[in-house]
Structure formats: structure tokens, C-alpha cells
Design a protein with these regions (language model features):
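Short, exposed beta-strand/loop patches in secreted or surface proteins that constitute
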Residues: 6-11
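A short, structured surface patch at a secondary-structure boundary
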Residues: 14-20, 24-112, 118-125
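Ligand-binding pocket segment of bilobal, Venus flytrap-like solute-binding proteins
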Residues: 16-19, 231, 239-252
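Stable alpha-helical elements in mature extracytoplasmic
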Residues: 49, 56-63, 69, 107, ...
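Extracytoplasmic substrate-binding proteins
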Residues: 52, 96, 109, 113-207, ...
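Alpha-helical, coiled-coil/dimerization segments enriched in small aliphatic residues
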Residues: 209-240
Length: 252
């Protein structure tokens, strides 16, 4: 296992208990299976099929594409023009996925009208806890994914398995993940080239945004045989993936 931010325990009858630290526990119940009595109050029941999902966390979309599960997503928290995933942009342009507002301002009326079975958010929603509370009040379970808290690229990719569980595509998820790990293996075995690389963007007020040293992008540079040039940058918190630098510091 590469991941550390979720665990999954399988039980007889196809039931699966998912535990996401600081985000909750979820019992996935197979379609047609009996309800489970006397569950702890903190456990959220997710009954399959989960086929009308409101997807807010953009990093999850590519994993759904790899699981051939775009048809499970009914609503998006990103507009069509905002998607970097071509399949998602096309699905929205064709009307197969509708825009239902960003994480801080969801269109509750549209979400309810679509019969939403699950909202997948990232930790940004924790800055607007009333949104999560309102969705749950309307009967829409909310799963806050924490893949951004994982320690490396393969750990983030392993969240594919969690969505495989939710979508009843466990075998496909396991196989896709295995293939991806095999593809990366030869790269990990090569010697470091010693070549340095930077990964950055420039803000409108002329600050340089760079990835901190332990961020997954910086790790990918190392995995590919390079040396991330900012080898001593850390954020104020473990969840902070970027740091802003003045131009003078960046070029120093």
C-alpha cells in the first residue's frame, strides 16, 4: 500500500466500510442488500448504485475517466471551460453532466432535482462547513476526499481503489492501478540524472508560486531522475502544497 489517508474493510455480502481520517466513515451497501442495524452514529450509509454524483473535487475526475465511470457523474462543481480533463469538458458540452455550482455556492435546487446520491468534495469545503451541513440536511451524503494529504504520487493515485469500491468497479480499479505502477517501475529504477528542474507559476501581483519540497509534483521530478531545485521549501502546514516567493528570492 502507498496510501495512508483511507482504509477499506470488506465484509460478507459485499459490504465495505471506508474510513477516511478526519473526514468520516462510510458503509457501502450493495444494491438490493439489507440495511445494517445498530450502526454507530458517525457512519454514513452509501447505498449502491451511486450513479448521480455531484463531483466537486477536480482531482477525482481523471480517476473516474480511468474507471470508465463518467456516466456516474450527474453534476459538476466546475464549468465546462474550467476542465483540463477533455472527457469531462466534452460530457458537459453535450449535456451529460450539468454544472451545479462551486463548492462554496452549490445549486441546491438542481442537486435535489437530479436525485444526487453522493457529493464528493475536497477539503476546501471545510472552510464553508454550512455547505456540507446543508447538503446532508437535504439527504445528500458528503464524502470529503483527502488525496492531497497523501505523501506521494502513487499514494494519490491509489485513491482509484476507493472510487472502485463506491462504483462497484473494484477489480477494474485494482487492475488499472497495477498497470500504472508497472509503467512507473522502470522510471523509478533509473539513476538520478543530476539535472535540476523548477515547477512554478506567476501570479498577477508578480509573486512566484512554487511547490514545496515534499509536494507530490516535486517528488515526481525526483522519481523521473531529476533534482527539484527548491530542495528546502516547506509550508506552514503539512497540507500546504504551494508557497509564494517574491521575484528576488526566486531568482537568487
Amino acid at each position: 500500500l502507498f496510501r495512508s489517508q483511507f482504509s477499506a474493510d470488506c465484509y460478507e455480502g459485499g459490504y465495505v466500510m471506508i474510513d477516511i481520517p478526519d473526514a468520516g466513515r462510510f458503509l457501502v451497501v450493495p444494491e438490493g442488500a439489507a440495511e445494517v442495524d445498530d450502526l454507530p452514529e458517525d457512519v454514513v450509509v452509501l447505498r449502491q448504485p451511486l450513479d448521480h454524483i455531484y463531483l466537486v473535487s477536480t482531482s477525482v475526475m481523471d480517476l473516474f475517466v480511468h474507471l470508465d465511470a463518467l456516466d456516474s457523474i450527474a453534476l459538476s462543481g466546475t464549468k465546462a471551460e474550467g476542465w483540463y480533463v477533455e472527457e469531462a469538458r466534452q460530457a458537459m458540452q453535450e449535456g451529460r453532466i450539468a454544472y451545479a455550482g462551486k463548492y462554496s455556492a452549490p445549486d441546491y435546487e438542481r442537486i435535489l432535482a437530479a436525485g444526487c446520491t453522493l457529493a464528493i468534495e475536497n477539503t476546501m469545503v471545510l472552510h464553508d462547513p454550512e455547505v456540507k451541513e446543508q447538503l446532508e440536511k437535504f439527504g445528500v451524503p458528503v464524502l470529503v476526499e483527502r488525496s492531497s494529504y497523501e505523501s506521494g504520487p502513487l499514494a494519490r493515485m491509489e485513491w482509484l481503489k476507493l472510487y472502485g469500491i463506491l462504483l462497484n468497479k473494484t477489480e477494474m480499479a485494482e487492475e488499472v492501478f497495477r498497470q500504472k505502477v508497472e509503467q512507473v517501475a522502470p522510471i523509478l529504477e533509473q539513476e538520478n540524472t543530476g539535472k535540476t528542474a523548477a515547477f512554478f507559476s506567476i501570479t498577477t501581483n508578480n509573486l512566484i508560486t512554487v511547490r514545496r519540497t515534499s509536494d507530490y509534483v516535486a517528488q515526481m521530478v525526483g522519481m523521473a531522475g531529476g533534482v527539484y531545485i527548491f530542495d528546502d521549501l516547506e509550508g506552514e502546514t503539512s497540507a500546504q502544497s504551494t508557497i509564494k516567493l517574491p521575484l528576488e528570492t526566486f531568482y537568487a
